[in-house]
């Protein structure tokens, strides 16, 4: 099987025999039932391939779709004038790049259709007049496809980069936003000349005028009809890649069922609507099947620096954001004047929907899968703690220690890790800040550890332990105290009854109390009962 890794052109995929997960039934529904759309999906999730597929569909290239679902649905195969802008390939941290790109594309189209544009008009105004001309010239309304519309904003988001304009200086974030607003708001006036419009991107910026006023696009990002339009569903994985999964299982010397479970835990877990359709990360799945190895393919392709910048100056830690139910208004629209990173984290693919409550119409958000847990949390831990030691390396050491039933290695590994955190990073003046720092540090460590071993979250009437790990032979119950004693931690395990559910268990139950010092920043006492 040939995997289209790095290939986003639909014609190339079809002509050269690469595997294609058939999304054309949804594509037909999209084109048949509406006109102007916006779709938000994380990077490398198939948006560009969707745009490319639509381009060839509206070009009437029927032969490319032979044998696909749309082949039996479409009967006309009309050709339409297509205007396609892809913002993917440009670096918008360079001043005036966005303006030159839009102006250049409009001028190219004017030459293509023999239209003399007025240089005194803005690119948006020239585009409106061009659409009207082409509609009249061809007798066909136009198709506009804009891929990664928000990249000019994401490139400069939350930076201090500036652009000089006449005798003034503006933040590039503001300048690029105003440029996009001018372009998008202008061509919205061309409604009568448009057959179909799709904008794709990572983030829905509420302050870009395409999402306000008349003729605004229908946002299908959370529409259950289209929740599987990008990515790979469980059914698609099983039907299209059944034999490939079996071959991968054979190479890794696991059963086919274990292989499917490994793929699910590492790459599944995305949900884009209240229907809770399971969606696998397509980029990682294709790479894993191609190389027959479980690796963090998607996360390695790009560090989410804009997210790190946002998180670095917000009072909200990741543990404040995960595991909570939200109204859609809290995580769908990103507003640049509000210092809440939640919408950006969700839409970038680092959080996803994990449950839906129909009574409150609210959504539970959490990390989607092990690839994201390990990569994103390690990145945050490195920036938050400032340690030279990798939190992932620590998690592996803790995992290996549990496998060997060696708690002394646990103690030594934790001690060394905490000792590597610079004093300037852990210095907190207020007691509440010290406590918050302490708990967030352990949240990051144990969420990363959970990608290697299952951490039990058993809620008791009196609360729950800081960490419970179950193996085939042992149960480990940890309780941590900041500026307390190990005896106090052990006493809490007894008083709260954390071990009670395991009284009839044949496995050995090991209770560990650990105290940390906010002054030294490391372990003071370690006792086992």
Task: Show the residue positions of the predicted features.
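Phosphate-binding site recognition
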Residues: 1-434, 449-450
């Amino acid at each position: 099987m040939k995997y289209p890794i790095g290939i986003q052109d639909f014609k190339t995929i079809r002509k050269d025999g690469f595997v294609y997960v058939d999304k054309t039934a949804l594509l037909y529904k999209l084109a048949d039932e509406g006109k102007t759309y916006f779709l938000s999906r994380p990077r490398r999730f198939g948006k560009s391939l969707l745009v490319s597929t639509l381009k060839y569909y509206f070009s009437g290239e029927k032969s490319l779709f032979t044998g696909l679902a749309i082949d039996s649905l479409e009967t006309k195969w009309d050709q339409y004038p297509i205007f396609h802008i892809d913002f993917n390939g440009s670096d918008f941290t360079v001043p005036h790049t966005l303006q030159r790109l839009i102006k250049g594309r409009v001028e190219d189209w004017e030459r293509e259709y023999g239209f003399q544009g007025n240089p005194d008009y803005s690119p948006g105004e020239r585009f409106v007049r061009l659409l009207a001309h082409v509609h009249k010239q061809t007798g066909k309304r136009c198709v506009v496809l804009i891929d990664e519309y928000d990249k000019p904003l994401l490139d400069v988001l939350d930076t201090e980069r500036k652009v000089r304009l006449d005798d003034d200086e503006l933040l590039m974030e503001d300048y690029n936003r105003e440029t996009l607003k001018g372009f998008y708001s202008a061509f919205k006036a061309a409604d009568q000349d448009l057959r179909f419009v799709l904008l794709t991107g990572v983030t829905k910026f509420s302050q870009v005028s395409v999402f306000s006023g008349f003729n605004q696009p229908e946002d299908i990002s959370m529409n259950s009809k289209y929740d599987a339009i990008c990515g790979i569903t469980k059914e698609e994985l099983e039907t299209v890649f059944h034999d490939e999964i079996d071959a991968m299982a054979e190479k890794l010397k696991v059963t086919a069922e274990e292989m499917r479970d490994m793929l699910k835990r590492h790459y599944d877990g995305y949900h884009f609507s209240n229907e809770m359709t399971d969606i696998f990360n397509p980029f990682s799945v294709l790479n894993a099947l191609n190389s027959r190895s479980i690796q963090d393919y998607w996360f390695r392709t790009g560090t989410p620096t804009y997210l790190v910048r946002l998180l670095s100056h917000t009072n909200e830690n990741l543990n404040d954001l995960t595991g909570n139910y939200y109204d859609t208004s809290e995580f769908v629209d990103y507003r640049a004047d509000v210092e809440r990173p939640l919408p950006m984290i969700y839409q970038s693919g680092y959080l996803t929907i994990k449950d839906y409550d129909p009574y409150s119409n609210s959504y539970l958000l959490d990390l989607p899968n092990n690839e994201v847990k390990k990569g994103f949390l390690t990145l945050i831990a490195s920036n938050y703690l400032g340690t030279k030691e990798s939190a992932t390396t620590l998690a592996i050491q803790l995992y290996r220690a549990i496998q060997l039933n060696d708690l002394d290695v646990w103690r030594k590994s934790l001690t060394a890790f905490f000792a590597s955190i610079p004093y300037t990073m852990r210095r907190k003046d207020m007691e509440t800040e010290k406590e918050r720092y302490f708990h967030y540090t352990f949240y990051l460590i144990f969420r990363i550890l959970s990608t290697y071993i299952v951490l039990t979250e058993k809620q008791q009437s009196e609360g729950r332990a800081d960490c419970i790990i179950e193996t085939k032979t042992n149960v480990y119950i940890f309780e941590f105290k900041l500026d307390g004693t190990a005896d106090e931690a052990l006493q809490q395990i007894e008083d709260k009854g954390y071990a009670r559910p395991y009284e009839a268990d044949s496995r050995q139950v090991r209770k560990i109390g650990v105290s940390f010092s906010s002054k030294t920043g490391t372990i003071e006492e370690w006792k086992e009962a």
